[in-house]
Curated annotation (Swiss-Prot):
GO terms for cellular component: cytoplasm. SUPFAM superfamilies: L30e-like (SSF55315), N-terminal domain of eukaryotic peptide chain release factor subunit 1, ERF1 (SSF55481), Translational machinery components (SSF53137). Heterodimer of two subunits, one of which binds GTP. It comes from Blepharisma americanum (Ciliate). The keyword Cytoplasm applies. This is Eukaryotic peptide chain release factor subunit 1. Signal peptide: none annotated. The gene is eRF1.
Amino acid sequence: MEGDELTQNIEQWKIKRLIDNLDKARGNGTSLISLIIPPREQLPIINKMITEEYGKSSNIKSRIVRQAVQSALTSTKERLKLYNNRLPANGLILYCGEVINEEGVCEKKYTIDFQPYRAINTTLYICDNKFHTQPLKDLLVMDDKFGFIIIDGNGTLFGTLQGNTKEVLHKFSVDLPKKHRRGGQSALRFARLRMESRNNYLRKVAEQAVVQFISSDKVNVAGLIIAGSAEFKNVLVQSDLFDQRLAAKVLKIVDVAYGGENGFTQAIELSADTLSNIKFIREKKVMSKFFEEVAQDTKKYCYGVEDTMKSLLMGAVEVILLFENLNFTRYVLKNPTTGIEKTLYLTPEQEENHDNFIENGEELEALEKGPLPEWIVDNYMKFGAGLEFITDRSQEGAQFVRGFGGLGAFLRYQVDMAHLNAGEEELDEEWDDDFM
């Protein structure tokens, strides 16, 4: 997976987890603030509105609710000050307020502000007993950008489709020589000229494809659809003139009855199924490769939380396969008597077992605690690894979650996991020497 695509996938994953947490939160009265500011807004106007809201809050009869609302408004105003009256390029999302438990006691205070990974067009300000997350969910609509090349004997159009928005990037016409009906040397000469014109046309299309769909030496679309009414579309894809980086991104070649913008519209309609399944197609390919490694017992794979984390820490992992909803907590625990630290990865059920936090009768001190998936996302690059998110919405992904624990990896070299587990202490010492 290329860097820009992986970065976006990570941002989307983080937003999904944030939505899950925010949707569970409840506040006292109208004390939870949801504030979403698109880039076109003026921050001083928003600041003025928050100040006015603070003044109005003095009319709230309940002292507890009034204090909670005013505390949230104050925190919101303080956060906005950090931006020095300048909104980030993609706008700003802010959630603030005290979350209460079932007994009505303050359990946690949220103050979350961030720039979304792409521009947000929604304006929202709501004080409620819950956070409003629909604009975040709208951000997660699969809006990958796809490139289209509509080519025939009359010209070529280059366009993109992102969500419901299509854009024509560039188009040009061509006047190719027609077939010559007469015989003799004249026919041979015209055939040669005709072939030369076709090759020049294909070269121009291939060069323009690079201009439109490659930026900073990287393909800037998630996939390509090549469409046309004649054989040009197939010749282009098979041609050595067509950049191999783009050829690798071709998702489908479709026949359309028209060229130009009408052909663009028809190509979108005929490729709809392919475009909607692009994420699952990628997931199927990754999972098929993983299952093949397992079936052949290449020892260049691992699965399960314990084996995958050991392999990652020793630098053996090439690509981590992470189920997007993996529910494990990472603990770093310290024995207060010996000073020895250890790391545990626990399920919610294991966290309820107090024995996991006792060693030789000693209560272990928790130095670190946090969701394991977040630790992986924050640290995988330190070990030179790649990352692939896996869902349970494809058959292969669901099998990975059920049968392999939702965490696995492709390894750089063969690792005997049985030997790794048996000699864990020796491996830990080697890792300390190499990385500490």
